[in-house]
Amino acid sequence: MTPTLAFCHFPFRKELMEIQEYRKARGYDGIEWSLDGWRLMMARGQRRHALDRLRTASPVCSLHAPYTDLEIGHRDTEHATAACRILRDYVDAAAELGAHHVNIHVGTFAPDPDELSNDNLVRNLAVLMEYAQHRGVQLTVENLRGGPSSEPESFAALLRQTGVPVTFDVGHARGCAWVQEGRGSVVDFLRAIPTPILASHIYLIERDDTHFAPQTVEDLAPTLDALIAAGCDFWVLELHSLKALEQTRGVVDQYLASR
């Protein structure tokens, strides 16, 4: 299996021409548009124009939905329902773009347990999944470094309750307390996931909201082996700087060439 190789636009901010030129020059298959700081416009004409520009920059893409102020599992049902409604717009955008998938967060920024409602989370995730299916879009949820998706047991419980597929974030898994405290490895975390892994965010580790690049193939090889074994064929190199992106791409290229 040769994975589809994409990168997140972070190093280039919103410079679409630079993003397009870099994608072509470096032979990437696609781009993940991370929209937390890049919201969709309400006016239909302006939204259509913005999506056309993203499509021109890369016909192959995935979307990372906003998360900073949206929580479908919030204990405040009004907030959770509103977040679910807003995220439907990003499912619509993914449908219009023909995106590979749209990825969401749950339990962002490791809220206190009493800030979340599992009932609201499961109900709203089911609503979003049904809507995504209606629109012909694959919806994924991502493991985070903190919160309910940061430990295999609680994450797997949510996945079993909902059947939602996963974007497996390698750096979040390596940076979470479960791995850092030696209770298991990144590969152990990955293998505990009971639903399909449709995509992966590839980098070494997240610390203080920064994504760090691997230095050698050995840093990532066991995890990449496990992703391939799991059938995950959409890899997003999610780095914040061009230097880190280039370093990670070199490691991934070396890994793929050795197979």
Give names to the regions the model predicted.
Residues 1-91, 95, 164-165, 255-259:
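N-terminal pre-domain/capping segments
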Residues 3-9, 31-33, 61-65, 102-104, ...:
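Hydrophobic faces of well-ordered beta-strands that scaffold small-molecule active sites
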Residues 8-18, 34-49, 71-74, 109-114, ...:
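Acidic-and-aromatic substrate-binding clefts and catalytic sites of carbohydrate-active enzymes
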Residues 73-166, 218-221:
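Active-site acidic/histidine proton-transfer and metal-coordination neighborhood
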Residues 131-217:
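Acidic/histidine-rich catalytic cores of soluble enzymes
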Residues 223, 227, 235:
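H/E-rich (His + Asp/Glu) clusters that bind or coordinate divalent metals
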Residues 244-259:
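C-terminal helical cap(s) of enzyme catalytic domains, especially alpha/beta-barrels
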